[in-house]
Amino acid sequence: VKLGIPHIFDVQLGYTFQRSHYDEPEVWSDNVEAVRRMFRTPDHYAYFTASANITRKFKASLFGNYTGEMLVQHNAGYIDADRSELTPSFWDLGLKLSYNFQLTNTIGLEINGGVKNFLDSYQDDIDRGAFRDSVYIFGPMMPRTFFLGLKFTL
């Protein structure tokens, strides 16, 4: 869905609901009961972007993704035995502010800055050490990250 008032405000959003299952239960470990639910496939996913032109030269944008709970495999090593884990749902939100300067009739400069993953959504049970499960990773890949940028336009 995309809504807005041209040159003032716009918002775009989407939502996906799905149930992903195998026809027959999948066995992935001798220690874990077979399941039909597909791993790493959340039932709920959503995204949005919203932008507002505060003034003719100043713009603010808010953007984000929502990922629902999902089942992931957690292999033994750091933990005592293989197990299936149900992850928490999480939001990954960002904010960007930008200001535009017209340097000449044909050259523009945008200065921007913001923060990605400002809620600092991050997996809090990452395995560590030599026996960690290197594929037991879910959620945003980056912690809270600040950024600055310049953009020239012709």
Task: Identify the meaning behind each predicted range.
Residues 1-75:
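Gram-negative outer-membrane beta-barrel transporters
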Residues 4, 14, 60, 64, ...:
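Small side chains
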Residues 4-6, 41, 53, 86-88, ...:
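Surface-exposed coil/turn segments at beta-strand junctions on protein surfaces, enriched
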Residues 11, 48, 95-97, 148-150:
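Membrane-embedded beta-strands of outer-membrane beta-barrel proteins
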Residues 28-37, 79-85, 133-138:
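Extracellular loop and loop/strand-boundary signature of outer-membrane beta-barrel proteins
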Residues 42-46, 89-93, 107, 142-146:
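Residues that define the transmembrane beta-barrel architecture of outer-membrane proteins
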Residues 68-73, 99-154:
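C-terminal beta-signal and adjacent terminal beta-strands/loops
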Residues 85-92, 154:
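Outer-membrane beta-barrel transmembrane domain signature
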